[in-house]
Amino acid sequence: MTLWINGDWVTGQGALRVKRNPVSGEVLWQGNDADAAQVGQACRAARAAFPRWARLSFGDRQVRVECFAGLLESNKAELTAIIARETGKPRWESATEVTAMINKIAISIKAYHVRTGEQRSEMPDGAASLRHRPHGVLAVFGPYNFPGHLPNGHIVPALLAGNTIIFKPSELTPWSGEAVMRLWQQAGLPPGVLNLVQGGRETGQALSALEDLDGLLFTGSANTGYQLHRQLSGQPEKILALEMGGNNPLIIDEVADIDAAVHLTIQSAFVTAGQRCTCARRLFLKSGTQGDAFLARLVAVSQRLTPGTWDDEPQPFIGGLISEQAAQQVVTAWQELEAMGGRTLLAPRLLQAGTSLLTPGIIEMTGVTGVPDEEVFGPLLRVWRYDNFDEAIRMANNTRFGLSCGLVSPEREKFDQLLLEARAGIVNWNKPLTGAASTAPFGGIGASGNHRPSAWYAADYCAWPMASLESDSLTLPATLNPGLDFSDEVVR
């Protein structure tokens, strides 16, 4: 039984799904998808649970959420292993994900009060008040790269605000989704407040098509995000928050410490085997001997990055991709770029057939036209050389996406120019593109999102504002508007 609906574990009535470790092929989890009828049951359960959950005080909801944080802490080792085995990530990185989940609780509580709390302004004849109210029933679609942390970034603020939820994990990480749901169960959420439905496209389409849904919170690919946007078009009453990845540029200008710049670039492009939505996909490198030296060093160090299994000792920097198919898609993308005229500096290699262990790839595309503006979700970095900083910014902005952008330079003036001209929601200076703070908004523009950033701003899309003018008594104004006569004289 792998679905959690209205406080009960039930067996899915859809197709059988089997999840294997992407490197070893070991069977980790199996269960049946939720069919459309079960998705409807989950929605009805969430709708029935909503009034009572929303009427609880914020403090009562906070107690349940903080209990979940405590359970994350006490089950950290077990959840770390589940995420690592299911995604192929190294143990160290999965541990940082669980830590981020724990930290998200306190941050979300603070963000609720700052972004969507209550305010009151006294007026001569009363007061003006601002409150926030939950939407109702929200669907949360989780991604596979951070199957605990990223859904958590929607679920926690949504529950704190008083919403009830139907959570569909990625079909590639059902085990992690179930493990997190079992911790929420132990936290004592009332039946129907949080429901889990497993499945792929059919389950997702059934969920997003529900009429009795007040909103949908999504993290994933641009293609799926666009499909959801089209599906919910003409329904302005439903909140839709989309985070859809990017084709992110990193500009390497002047470099004082080549190794430090190489380290930043590797952290930006290859951490999580390139499976972060903020990863650098395009590297813009200043022409000249310094740029040549940097590029040679980048290739040399990247060549030493050998992916390993989740429990390898010593621990590897990167593990496997989410699947062999995902790894092969990166290799295919590299081959297509090479066929267009790209110059391979480091070829990505599948270490062993039947696994997802893929070494990083670097290919120079300077002078090549018609390069697709697509996100290659893996460890493949494309390089362009530029002559002046204005050209670098133009090239960086030449994308339909707009999630992250970064600059390596000692010159504050150039960063200030980038801040003015960059088309991205995250713009970093001498910091990896993959570095983000939960105390700041996280999201992009263009094909990277629909202006509903998460993290610190997640509270904004989890509640709507209610403004009130209030007075505890009603009296006739001392001064009336022209044309109003409340005298006792009878007009004849």
Curated annotation (Swiss-Prot):
It catalyses: N-succinyl-L-glutamate 5-semialdehyde + NAD(+) + H2O = N-succinyl-L-glutamate + NADH + 2 H(+). Coiled coil: none annotated. Pathway: Amino-acid degradation; L-arginine degradation via AST pathway; L-glutamate and succinate from L-arginine: step 4/5. Pfam families: Aldedh. InterPro entries: Ald_DH/histidinol_DH, Ald_DH_C, Ald_DH_CS_CYS, Ald_DH_CS_GLU, Ald_DH_N, Aldehyde_DH_dom, SuccinylGlu_semiald_DH_AstD. The active site is at E243, C277. Its EC number is 1.2.1.71. The keyword Oxidoreductase applies. Keywords: Arginine metabolism, NAD, Oxidoreductase. Gene3D superfamilies: Aldehyde Dehydrogenase, Chain A, domain 1, Aldehyde Dehydrogenase, Chain A, domain 2. GO terms for biological process: arginine catabolic process to glutamate; arginine catabolic process to succinate. NAD(+) binds at G220, S221, A222, N223, T224, G225. One of its GO terms (molecular function) is succinylglutamate-semialdehyde dehydrogenase activity. NCBIfam families: arg_catab_astD, PRK09457.1. Belongs to the aldehyde dehydrogenase family. AstD subfamily. Catalyzes the NAD-dependent reduction of succinylglutamate semialdehyde into succinylglutamate. This is N-succinylglutamate 5-semialdehyde dehydrogenase. It comes from Escherichia coli O127:H6 (strain E2348/69 / EPEC). The lineage of its organism: Bacteria, Pseudomonadati, Pseudomonadota, Gammaproteobacteria, Enterobacterales. The gene is astD.
